[in-house]
């Protein structure tokens, strides 16, 4: 899972073109398309999102269509961009304030969009609540392969500290599961 050459461990994309490889090796760049969104859709059993992925839809355009209530073909670039920000922001616990600071939306518009998002993908809200409750009861969460992330501050009386742990309760299993999948793929490529 790592290079045997220290300097190549953190190879930047722009530097790959300047690396010479012998005939027995290749440099490979691979990416799982929207892996974190696919993972949260699966873990949450969010059927609307799963169906969009299974139908080969662009998830950001599909989300924009749902939250703005317009046909996919009429989605503007700005609306798709806002939906993309919401899609990824949900994983990181974005608030109306956070969304408004990342987009041209007002805080009120951001709240309306986040509410519409959860109406479009109701399984996600349920999943998020279950993750936080599980962490509060057990003090940890797990990735799909059982790696644990302990959250010692999940029951903190300090709302700021507790809020950070609650966001970790949602995103750590998703990011950790993505890492699990990618590392397994790296091992399998090497076989």
Predicted regions and their residues:
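Single conserved hydrophobic/aromatic residue that forms the stacking wall/gate
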Residues: 1-13
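Short hydrophobic beta-strand that contains or immediately precedes a catalytic carboxylate
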Residues: 27-31
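A short acidic-Thr-Gly-centered motif at the start of a beta-strand
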Residues: 14-26, 191
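Short secondary-structure boundary/capping segments
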Residues: 7-10, 43-47
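Conserved catalytic core of nucleic-acid polymerases
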Residues: 65-191
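Hydrophobic (often cysteine-bearing) scaffold residues that line and stabilize catalytic clefts
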Residues: 5, 36, 56, 60, ...
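Short, polar/flexible loop-turn hinges at active-site or ligand-entry regions and domain interfaces
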Residues: 47-53, 71-75
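Short active-site loop/helix that positions an aromatic residue
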Residues: 33-45
